[in-house]
Each structure stands twice: as structure tokens, then as C-alpha cells.
UniProtKB/Swiss-Prot annotation:
PANTHER family: 40S RIBOSOMAL PROTEIN S24. It comes from Natronomonas pharaonis (strain ATCC 35678 / DSM 2160 / CIP 103997 / JCM 8858 / NBRC 14720 / NCIMB 2260 / Gabara) (Halobacterium pharaonis). SUPFAM superfamilies: Ribosomal proteins S24e, L23 and L15e. The gene is rps24e. This is Small ribosomal subunit protein eS24. Keywords: Ribonucleoprotein, Ribosomal protein.
Amino acid sequence: MDVDIIDEDENPMLHRTDVRFQLTHEEATPSRLSVRDSLAAKLNKDASEVVVRKLDTKYGMRKTVGHAKVYDSADDAKAVEQDHALERNKIEADEEADEEAAEEA
């Protein structure tokens, strides 16, 4: 799987970089986790700092275009991203937020 960076936009207010990328793959569309790991390796970041938001593969093509958010730290990702996005990318949500939700219930 080859990863090519199409565009990078800095977002200093949220301590992240928005990245658009293109994957070239031989088999079926790769999993979100394998894409996250490949993109993190390409950008020299830890995998917990990368959140893959969208993957789009056209029918019959072996190319996938995607959008990811690369944070300065995993804590920044946990503070900004929605819980379902963190779950999809296998990034553990804050335990404090889980405890607060359990207390309210």
C-alpha cells in the first residue's frame, strides 16, 4: 500500500494538521487501522495522534482518497475528537469522561 499526501492544512487553534491523502492498493480497500498506521509512519507520528475521518474508494478502482486529522499529541486528539471517531480509530477515550457519564446515569 502506497500513501501519497495530497494536501496538508495547519490548524493551530486545535493543535492539528488536516491531511488529504491517496492510497494505492492491490487488494480490497485497507482497514482504517492499517491506513492509520501507514499514514502515521509516513508522517513520523505516533498512531494515537492520527484520526482517519474518511476513506472513499470508487468502484473497481485500486485507489482510495481519504481525510485524516493529525494532532500534536494523543491528549489533543482525545480532547477535540468525538467519541465515535476515537472508537473507530481505536484510540482510548478519557477515562474521566467515562466515569462522569457513569455517575450521571
